[in-house]
Amino acid sequence: MELSFFTTFEIGWLNGWIPSFAMLLVQIIFMMLFPQGGKRAVDTSWYTPRDRRYALLSSAAQAAVLIVSIFAPFKFGTAWFTVGTVVYLIAFVLFIWSFFSYKAGKPGETIQGGIYRYSRNPMYFFFMLGMLGVCIATASLWLLIVMVPFAVFTHGIILGEERYCEATYGEGYRKYKARTPRYFLIV
């Protein structure tokens, strides 16, 4: 079984959109249940023009990923599906944990508890990992192709956020940054 390019582009009810939109739904539910934490998470008042461009490009790329996932059927009964499902489920659980860890953080302080002990950007990382799981479970090269710019533009957002955190939280954030990888156990 190999990654499929043209053969997987078909609309269906049992396609990659189900887990893809579930990841988006988690974000929406968090914003509704915890409006203060949600407000803090989406505050872009400090964005530079470059950060705004990255945010716009990342949002457009995320929309493309979600749209392409509608046309990417799962490869049920294959190793692709099994491995992709396991990757997705692990990422989904850790993605949810990252929201609860974020909520537990105190306003005005660097969030360092929960899963933030292992990653400075767990929401981004586990969203990407979950979407990679969907790519694997569908064996869709189309989906993988649109994931690449999404990951690149999101990385640009992360770099901007880290500059902001360093300027805002100073030495405390620099110490946190020195001991905690940007992406779960890497970098």
Question: For each predicted feature, which ranges?
Answer:
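Membrane-anchoring alpha-helices and their flanking helix-loop junctions
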Residues: M1-G113, F125-V187
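Histidine-centered phosphotransfer motif of kinases
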Residues: R117-F125
